[in-house]
Design a protein with these regions (language model features):
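PLP-dependent amino-acid enzyme catalytic core
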Residues: 1-295
């Protein structure tokens, strides 16, 4: 394969078989390595699809200014792709987001607005909504944009199906905007309705960057409960521990949301006699080096 343009490098990420985490040799645990996307996370897929579709429809025009609330990875992906299309963008995120994330967004030319940490991503969403209501901004709104989940219907789902040669039995994904799990589920269920779709969310009181147990009034509009067979709570401690185990036992340096997903996947693996479980590794661990995750 010869040289590729950056946007053509989004997707087709590796699917890696773990070798140490699962003791039952009749159960395969496969990791979808989304940190291999050019922007470093699974969010490259949705960001590209949302911007490209909006441009094609004429929803975004030259000179427009975008604003978006994000916990980090979507913001980085949007900043990267917006600059390719020469679109101005402001990104709103909680002030306790890691320095690596905010600096990366600024490196891509985005304006970064920080909202109080105590308000979390909900505070960032409220701020962005108010700015749009005041005029002068357009919002892609990843939480309500069908082009978010459709990115995974078009790419992530088919990749998993093809790479497992149709043998996948379980799919596990952390739930933030829920675009990854809804889009991938929609495709996989069309191929085999018996594939189990499992969402990972933080247990009460746990803080896991990138995923959230949403209050009903803030539940992403793209979420479709019929597409998810089971939602499993994972504690912050479990997610931290598994994130460290991924690095030490499998050589995968990832963020805490990935640890949460794999912790849930491993619980499922321990109950199965046989199966093929695919879990999403959302991003890379280098986005969290200024936090205490790897202390």
């Amino acid at each position: 394969m010869g040289p590729q343009k950056l946007l053509n490098l989004i997707g087709n990420t590796p699917l890696m078989e773990t070798v140490n985490l699962v003791k039952n040799k009749n159960v395969k645990l496969l990791l979808k390595l989304e940190g291999n996307n050019p922007g470093g996370s699974v969010k490259d897929r949705a960001a590209y699809n949302m911007i490209a579709a909006a441009l094609e429809r004429g929803d975004i025009k030259k000179g427009d200014k975008l604003i978006e609330a994000t916990s980090g990875n979507t913001g980085i992906a949007l900043a990267m792709i917006a600059q390719l299309f020469q679109i101005e963008i402001e990104l709103v995120l909680p002030e306790d987001s890691t320095k690596e994330r905010t600096q990366t967004m600024r490196a891509y030319g985005a304006t970064v607005i920080l909202t109080p940490a105590s308000e979390g991503i909900i505070g960032s969403r409220d701020y962005a909504d108010k700015k749009v209501a005041q005029g002068g901004y357009l919002m892609l709104n990843q939480f309500a944009n069908d082009d978010n989940w459709k990115a995974h219907y078009k790419t992530t789902g088919p990749e998993i199906w093809n790479d497992t040669e149709g043998t996948v039995t379980h799919f596990v994904s952390a739930m933030g905007t829920t675009g990854t799990i809804i889009g991938t589920s929609t495709y996989l269920k069309e191929k085999n309705k018996n594939i189990q779709i499992i969402g990972a969310q933080p247990s009460d009181g746990s803080q896991i960057p990138g995923i959230r147990k949403w209050p009903q009034e803030y539940l992403p509009k793209i979420f479709d409960a019929s597409k998810v067979d089971t939602v499993v709570d994972v504690s912050e401690e479990e997610a931290r521990e598994m994130t460290k185990r991924l690095a030490l036992e499998e050589g995968i340096f990832a963020g805490m949301s990935s640890g949460g997903s794999v912790a849930v996947a491993l619980k499922i693996a321990e109950k199965l006699e046989s199966g093929v479980i695919v879990a999403v590794i959302c991003d890379r661990g280098d986005r969290y080096l200024s936090s205490d995750l790897f202390d």
